[in-house]
Amino acid sequence: MKQLQDEITQALTKLDGGSEFHEDSWERPEGGGGRSRVLRDGAIFEQAGVNFSEVWGSHLPPSILAQRPEAEGHGFYATGTSLVLHPRNPYVPTVHLNYRYFEAGPVWWFGGGADLTPYYPFAEDAAHFHQTLKLACDEHHPEYYPVFKRWCDEYFYLKHRDETRGVGGLFFDYQDGQGVLYRGPNPKGEAANYSNQVGEPASRDWEDLFSFIQGSGKAFLPAYVPIVERRHGMEYGDRQRNFQLYRRGRYVEFNLVYDRGTIFGLQTNGRTESILMSLPPLVRWEYGYQPEPNSPEAELYDTFLKPQDWSNWTANQ
């Protein structure tokens, strides 16, 4: 997890070229700590945060025990790396990544994923991101991507807005190598239905899953950096910037209302500055906003905030 943080921050520093990461090391009184790295006011990134944490304690919080009751009464160990990158140019999408590992008494599991949140509709960007993640998944199991992509669409969904947070990517949790792949809260959703059709894959051990996490983590830079390089030089005006700031509001809404990592961090007395590092530095809300018909903003709502089969997209569609 530390190595992933190192590799990503080094690459992002080089990519941005205008600022560097500032590191805060912190300790958690109940056990553990972490390193938070934040780049601010860069040439490309308005704010970029890449966190590593490793914490332990005497008992898991209610948000985890609700899903894994067999961990009740055991101490826990949790480690992970997470990032959120908020670019300055509205044509460059925001991106999020998180990979984590938990142990509690007799149980252990991996979780995580990566997802893309564009402000303007470029289908080739969404397709590149998905295709790169799918390749990393396919090296380990042919059903990882189809299940975890659907789970991502389900998880990064703002129920009160009836829209996805972006074009998705991968999301998974409670992966211990046993049972069906989907372990989420919606037994009647698309992810569960697909996972049930596939059935239980062959048992996978700790090393198999750790290798999958490593491969997915390494796929992040090739999935995202080419998109940044393609878009960050595009000219934009007040209209695009205002729309970006408005759409960033959805990011805030999701992270404060639904995000499991935020809730876990706050319930376990994590470092608040690190937990809320995912929030953008500038954001705006607007009462009753409606995009103009047939505009790029309307296309975002009509196509990009609904689940699509991005990995099979081709340029002539």
Curated annotation (Swiss-Prot):
Pathway: Porphyrin-containing compound metabolism; protoporphyrin-IX biosynthesis; protoporphyrinogen-IX from coproporphyrinogen-III (O2 route): step 1/1
Localization (cell): Cytoplasm
Enzyme class: oxidoreductase
GO cellular component labels: cytoplasm
Residues at which substrate binds: S82, N98, Y99, R100, N269, G270, R271, T272, E273, S274
Swiss-Prot/TrEMBL keywords: Cytoplasm, Oxidoreductase, Porphyrin biosynthesis
Listed GO MF terms: coproporphyrinogen oxidase activity; protein homodimerization activity
Gene3D superfamilies listed in its UniProt record: Coproporphyrinogen III oxidase, aerobic
EC number in record: 1.3.3.3
Reaction equation(s) it catalyzes: coproporphyrinogen III + O2 + 2 H(+) = protoporphyrinogen IX + 2 CO2 + 2 H2O
Residues the UniProt record annotates as site (Important for dimerization): H160
Protein family according to the UniProt entry: Belongs to the aerobic coproporphyrinogen-III oxidase family.
Function as written in the Swiss-Prot or TrEMBL entry: Key enzyme in heme biosynthesis. Catalyzes the oxidative decarboxylation of propionic acid side chains of rings A and B of coproporphyrinogen III.
Name under which the protein is recorded: Coproporphyrinogen-III oxidase, aerobic 1
